Amino acid sequence: MGITAATEMALRRHLVAQLDNQLGGTSYRSVLMYPEKMPRPPWRHETHNYIRSGPGPRFLDAPGQPAGMVAAVVSDGTTVAAGYLTGSGSRAALTSTGRSQLERIAGSRTPLTLDLDGLGRYRVLAAPSRNGHDVIVTGLSMGNVDATMLQMLIIFGIVTVIALVAATTAGIVIIKRALAPLRRVAQTASEVVDLPLDRGEVKLPVRVPEPDANPSTEVGQLGSALNRMLDHIAAALSARQASETCVRQFVADASHELRTPLAAIRGYTELTQRIGDDPEAVAHAMSRVASETERITRLVEDLLLLARLDSGRPLERGPVDMSRLAVDAVSDAHVAGPDHQWALDLPPEPVVIPGDAARLHQVVTNLLANARVHTGPGTIVTTRLSTGPTHVVLQVIDNGPGIPAALQSEVFERFARGDTSRSRQAGSTGLGLAIVSAVVKAHNGTITVSSSPGYTEFAVRLPLDGWQPLESSPR
């Protein structure tokens, strides 16, 4: 709009200047054609061979005078002659209002713009005659100037409208193209909203397409952030599903493990009621009840320990002599399994680390019990302790039949079994290795297993330092 206004002003000044130049020539010719000595009224006494009849000054009929020209002769403030040239070249009279308008500008010597009565806008100029008494007023129509300006405004208007329509259309297209990735991001979010995330196994395959997740653009950064959020949610949902699955399996296995000794207790109790007069049979039944009760007690204690470890409750912290602990555990294992061969491989100096002595003793005891239960008589079980720059490594190695490859990834699961039967070897709760894994993890350590026929190794890595003494927790 500013450019249009500036162009209009410049063009109008140029056209008016051209008209003023033409007006100056017309005024000059009119002054030349006006006699120096002309009797004042009546005007009709003036004679020239080119004069035609009609109102107005006769110099309107001079050669070169343009059509539409107005002219007046003002003498002593009174218009003595006034008229204009029609399109056919004849003279016509001005209205009285038009004559008065020309009289009023007789004293001016610069071009002026007048809206002449009955004729329209004119550019007029007053000039003294050669006799020095009269004033010659001439004027040229501004119709061409106004028509040119109107045409220019129409052209500018059309061009402006076309430009606005084109700019608007281009803007809409550009905005739609720019917002298309954002719409796809919103579509992805809407698809996620429609997924049933509150139940069952949840899969979250929906992602923002890779081209819309380019971090080089703002929309791409949004898409990338949404993908990362969806990845995090998917991982959390998968973890939740895995946890729920483990809990369900754990509850099912725990129920089975408790159901078996409870059924035995109930059966032996009913048996004692039927054979009350047989002291030997009653004694045997009561011993079995006591055995199954002890089994339930161990199972419940193991479950409570795992629950405490799962909840992240801190263990007791203090210096633990791993060498002494290994010696004691192997001695106990030798008493429990005299048909096995037990060996120790310890460094010359005691190995002391920070930790919970009772739980670390349980780690070694459970590993040795696992080797004793799952290997045959005569198996050599070696307990080896070594130190590194930052860790202590405890290894329990046996030359038994080994662990099936399919089971090695599950040996630290709760109630893991090497076969499909629901039987459990005497004295085993099925939680020993699960407790080992949980205790080692609570000490910021790791445990691994490697096995093949004739060789099985459990390796526990525990940090040498980095533990801060904590208050003991309720056990």
Curated annotation (Swiss-Prot):
Q: Where in the cell is it found?
A: Cell membrane
Phenotype on disruption? Cells lacking TcrX and TcrY show an increase in virulence in mouse model of infection, with significantly shorter survival times.
EC number(s) reported in the record: 2.7.13.3
Molecular function GO labels: ATP binding; calcium ion binding; magnesium ion binding; phosphorelay sensor kinase activity; protein homodimerization activity
Q: Which GO terms describe its cellular component?
A: cytosol; plasma membrane
SUPFAM superfamilies documented for this protein:
ATPase domain of HSP90 chaperone/DNA topoisomerase II/histidine kinase, Homodimeric domain of signal transducing histidine kinase
Has keyword Kinase? yes
**What's an example GO BP annotation here?**
phosphorelay signal transduction system
- InterPro entries according to UniProt: HAMP_dom, HATPase_C_sf, His_kinase_dom, HisK_dim/P_dom, HisK_dim/P_sf, Sig_transdc_His_kin-like_C, TCS_sensor_his_kinase
Modification after translation is described as: Autophosphorylated.
Q: Which SMART domains match?
A: HAMP, HATPase_c, HisKA
Which stretches of this protein does UniProt put in the Cytoplasmic compartment?
Answer: 175-475
Can you give the residue ranges of the Histidine kinase domain?
A: 253-466
Q: How does it assemble?
A: Homodimer.
Question: What's the protein here called?
Answer: Probable sensor histidine kinase TcrY
Please name the source species: Mycobacterium tuberculosis (strain ATCC 25618 / H37Rv)
Q: What is the lineage of its organism?
A: Bacteria, Bacillati, Actinomycetota, Actinomycetes, Mycobacteriales
